[in-house]
Every structure is written in C-alpha cells, then in structure tokens.
C-alpha cells in the first residue's frame, strides 16, 4: 500500500455517496489507498453500494481491496484513458471482489493489456478510434435496479436489487 504523500492533493479528495430510492452509488474521486483504508477500517461507515465509480482512473495508488471488497458493488465504471489506468493489481482487486462485480471501462487500456482489460463489450472506447468518443450510460431506478449501457456497441446489462 502506498505511503502517505505529503503535499499530494489527491489525499484531500472527498468521497460521495449518491442514493436514488434504494439505488446507491459511491464515487471516491482520486482518494489514495491509505485514505480509503483509514475510512473503511476497522468499520465500514458506508455500507454496500450497487455501483462504484472506480477511483483515480483505476491506478494502483487508489482502489484498495479494503474499499472495493467492503462496498460489494454489483458493477464498477472506471474512467480510465487509453494510456492511463487499469493497473493489473487493481484489475485483480476488482476481479476478486466478493460481490462478483462487472467492470466497465471508458477506454481499452494499453497499460493493462489483453489479460487485465474488461471483456470488449464492457469497454466504451477501443484502441485508436479516429477521435470518436463513446460514453457509458447508467439508468437507475428507485427500486434499486439499474441498467448500464455501452453507447459504442449498445451492449446493455441490467442489475437487480
């Protein structure tokens, strides 16, 4: 786990918890691992969430197992870039989550390679798309169910409460 870095603004990141009826989503911005662990241990004050926005582009300085595993999300969306994010250690943490979650990515990650990227249908932007950009859309319902859609290929998955 990374040591506390003095003067790093990421250590001052705030986390947000969004709720719409029974649907719950968390976003911890660029929060660093040591802050995540301090937040979640020894007791998890957040509880579980349905959807987690992956922290810090999926970099290994964030996305601790203490946070991801305690939240038990059904899905996560990682706002990575083609050359930034989805560190192999982070991919292992998400794949090992007790919630059995799906990982959705904004971009195919050259850093992660074939082994650690999500399956193609879960990736909004593949390699070298000639400046085309696609989004990932989330539609949440008050009953706690939600649907995630990859706007590049119209792949959709609905998660139940």
Where are these regions (language model features)?
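Cap/insert and terminal regions of metallo-dependent hydrolase folds
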Residues: 7-11, 29, 33-129
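Core dinuclear metal-dependent hydrolase active-site scaffold
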Residues: 1-51, 124-161
């Amino acid at each position: 786990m990374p040591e506390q870095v003095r003067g790093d603004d990421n250590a001052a990141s705030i986390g947000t918890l969004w709720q719409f009826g029974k649907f719950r989503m968390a976003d911890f911005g660029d929060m660093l691992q040591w802050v995540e662990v301090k937040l979640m241990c020894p007791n998890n004050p957040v509880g579980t969430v349905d959807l987690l926005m992956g922290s810090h582009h999926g970099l290994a300085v964030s996305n601790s197992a203490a946070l991801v595993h305690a939240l038990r999300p059904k899905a996560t969306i990682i706002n990575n870039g083609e050359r930034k994010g989805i560190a192999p250690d982070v991919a292992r943490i998400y794949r090992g989550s007790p919630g059995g979650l799906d990982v959705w990515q904004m971009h195919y990650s050259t850093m992660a390679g074939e082994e650690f990227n999500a399956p193609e249908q879960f990736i909004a932007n593949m390699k070298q798309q000639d400046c085309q950009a696609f989004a990932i859309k989330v539609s949440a319902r008050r009953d706690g169910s939600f649907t995630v859609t990859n706007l590049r290929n119209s792949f959709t998955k609905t998660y139940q409460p």
